[in-house]
Amino acid sequence: MNTFATLAVLFCACLIGNCHGGYGGGGHGGYVQQGSYGQRSNGGAASAASSAAAAGNQRPVEIIAGGPRGGYGHGHEILRPIQLGYGGHSQRVPQHGSYGRRSGYGPRWTVQPAGATLLYPGQNNYRAYVSPPEYTKVVLPVRPAEPVAKLYIPENHYGSQQNYGTYAPQQSYNVEGPRY
C-alpha cells in the first residue's frame, strides 16, 4: 500500500507539472527582455514599468533588476509577465533563439525572503543568514532570602578530647597553641 501511495503521488505531481508549466503565462516563454517593450537603456525599474505601460500592455508585469546573466544584455531590467490564472494547459511556444524554460538559470526568488541578506545584487542570489535570536533582558531584583536550614556551628568544643584535661566551656582547645 505504501508503494502504491508513493507512485500515485509521483504520478499526480508529474501531471500537475505538465499542465501548469512553471514560469510565464500562456503565450509567453520564460523571461522577456525589457527591449522587447521598446526601451533599451539602463533607466531602472520605474522606466521599465512605464515603458511597458506606454506600449499598451495592460497585463501585470514583474520587474526583475538583473545584471549580466547568460543570454541577456548587460545591465537591462527584465520584465516577466505574472500568470494570473492557472486554468487549462499553458501554450508555451519557445521564442526566437530560446529553448523554453531553462530550469537551472535565472533567479529562484524574485522577492527577497524575510531575514535574508542580499549577497550578489546583480544576479538576484539571496543567501539567508540566520542571526541568533535576541531575547529581551529583564533585570530581576536580588534580595537575600532566609536561610534554608539552620547549620550547627560548634564553638570550638571538639567533642570529648581527653588529652587536654577536663571539659571547660569557656576554654577553647587547639586554637591558641600550647599554654605554659
Curated annotation (Swiss-Prot):
It is found in: Secreted. GO terms for cellular component: egg chorion; extracellular region. Residues 1-21 form the signal peptide. It comes from the Eukaryota. Keywords: Secreted, Signal. Chorion membrane (egg shell) protein; plays a role in protecting the egg from the environment. This is Chorion protein S19. It comes from Drosophila subobscura.
